[in-house]
UniProtKB/Swiss-Prot annotation:
Pathway: Carbohydrate degradation; glycolysis; pyruvate from D-glyceraldehyde 3-phosphate: step 4/5. Binds a second Mg(2+) ion via substrate during catalysis. InterPro entries: Enolase (IPR000941), Enolase-like_C_sf (IPR036849), Enolase-like_N (IPR029017), Enolase_C (IPR020810), Enolase_CS (IPR020809), Enolase_N (IPR020811). It comes from Haemophilus influenzae (strain PittEE). It holds the Pfam family Enolase_C. The gene is eno. The lineage of its organism: Bacteria, Pseudomonadati, Pseudomonadota, Gammaproteobacteria, Pasteurellales. NCBIfam families: eno. (2R)-2-phosphoglycerate binds at Q167, K343, R372, S373, K394. This is Enolase.
Length: 436
């Protein structure tokens, strides 16, 4: 038995200068797990609650001392003495103790930090790397794959202080044979994009996720700049590198008139018009994945978009599904989208996250493992991507150490598996729904 002997919570700082929750779980034998909860900027309305103090005299109300107190008191008292290797039981104890549908009593930030720290401690007690332990929890021990990165190299929307409406313009180095090669391609395109933007007299300041955040006349201009950068780097767009976008449509959807109002471009669209706007972009550029291409509540619009684009474009639900199996199940039954973005702080525990990934895969949906815009040096999502063989990861651009920490962990994992004589496959474009 890997007995829990101590649980510690503390307030630390994330990549945006805001507090977040970090937890330590200590086991008999001296094994320790340490994990921190991430935080989002553009959030779905049905996400599990991130508990903030609201005390304007500290961190502009964004302190997390209440959540930390829950870790140090109620949660610690409930799980000390339990077996850390019973992950589902540990998570369920915290969920039941919280007693709310959206974890608003303790906060998903408190529960998740402990959940992940517990998994890390349990993995250490079994002498396993975290990705291998996650594979065991997932019922797929020894089955790994390295994820195809979706690299956010131009930031807009809520992730940047510019006039670009679409939140993320991403590249996928699909021509790579290994994760390490994919990162090299991504870095070379990123540096060439800096040259392209400088030559146009544009800003090379970066947004929350490490991508550039220039003012551009249109979303098509962002794609044109990326195309130029890919070619300058010596690669072929559509062969070596494909494109992906996160529209974060809920951020520019006007619920009062039902219009998608892209203020940066000075254009407004109905739901169906916006789908056809995106369809035109996919005809001009090799865009193989679109995330949140409709407002989270516009299920009729999503159904139409899936009908129009779903046979050839990966349509990822982020705000749409919020890593929630109840919502995902309904979406699967109604034929909404064909992929889910996985953010474990949207649901608040490792066990529930694994359940969402399994449900998606069983239904033929892909699962894209994702960071949040507010991150720390915690690289757990790298292990999650490999341990569940998810196939794709979204963890930012080629700058900011909070993003690079995840890529570096993936490098370590890929190398470790190769050294062990059990290299993990890198799926490339085959990982993307509709592209196999």
């Amino acid at each position: 038995m890997a007995k829990i002997v101590k649980v510690i919570g503390r307030e630390i700082i994330d990549s945006r200068g805001n507090p977040t929750v970090e937890a330590e779980v200590h086991l008999e034998g001296g094994f320790v797990g340490l994990a921190a909860a991430p935080s989002g900027a553009s959030t779905g309305s049905r996400e599990a609650l991130e508990l903030r103090d609201g005390d304007k005299s500290r961190f502009l109300g964004k302190g997390v001392l209440k959540a930390v107190a829950a870790v140090n008191n109620e949660i610690a008292q409930a799980i000390v003495g339990k077996d850390a290797t019973n992950q589902a039981e540990i998570d369920q104890i915290m969920i039941d103790l919280d007693g709310t549908e959206n974890k608003s009593n303790f906060g998903a930030n408190a529960i998740l930090a402990v959940s992940l720290a517990n998994a890390k401690a349990a993995a250490a007690s079994k002498g396993l790397p975290l990705y291998a332990y996650i594979a065991e929890l997932n019922g797929s021990a020894g089955v790994y794959s390295m994820p195809l990165p979706m690299m956010n190299i131009i930031n807009g929307g809520e992730h940047a202080d510019n006039n670009v409406d679409i939140q993320e313009f991403m590249i996928q180095p699909v021509g790579a044979k290994t994760l390490r090669e994919a990162l090299r391609i991504g870095a070379e395109v990123f540096h060439n994009l800096a040259k392209v933007l400088k030559a146009k007299g544009m800003s090379t300041a970066v947004g929350d996720e490490g991508g550039f955040a220039p003012n551009l006349a249109s979303n098509a201009d962002a794609l044109a700049c990326i195309k130029e950068a890919v070619e300058k780097a010596g690669y072929v767009l559509g062969k070596d590198v494909t494109l992906a976008m996160d529209c974060a449509s809920s951020e520019f959807y006007n619920k009062e008139n039902g219009m998608y109002e892209m203020k940066g471009e000075g254009k407004s669209f109905t739901s169906q018009e916006f789908t056809h706007y995106l369809e035109e972009l996919t005809k001009q550029y090799p865009i193989v994945s679109i995330e949140d291409g409709q407002d989270e509540s516009d299920w009729e619009g999503f159904a139409y978009q899936t009908k129009v684009l779903g046979d050839r474009v990966q349509l990822v639900g982020d705000d749409l599904f919020v890593t929630n199996t109840k919502i995902l199940k309904e979406g699967i039954e109604k034929g909404i989208a064909n992929s889910i973005l996985i953010k474990f702080n949207q649901i608040g525990s490792l066990t529930e996250t694994l359940a969402a990934i399994k449900m998606a895969k069983d239904a033929g949906y892909t699962a894209v493992i994702s960071h949040r815009s507010g991150e720390t040096e915690d690289a757990t999502i790298a292990d999650l991507a490999v341990g569940t063989a998810a196939g794709q990861i979204k963890t930012g651009s080629m700058s900011r150490s909070d993003r690079i920490a995840k890529y570096n962990q993936l490098i370590r994992i890929e190398e470790a598996l190769e050294r062990a004589g059990t290299p993990a496959a890198f799926p490339g474009l085959k990982a993307v729904k509709g592209q196999a």
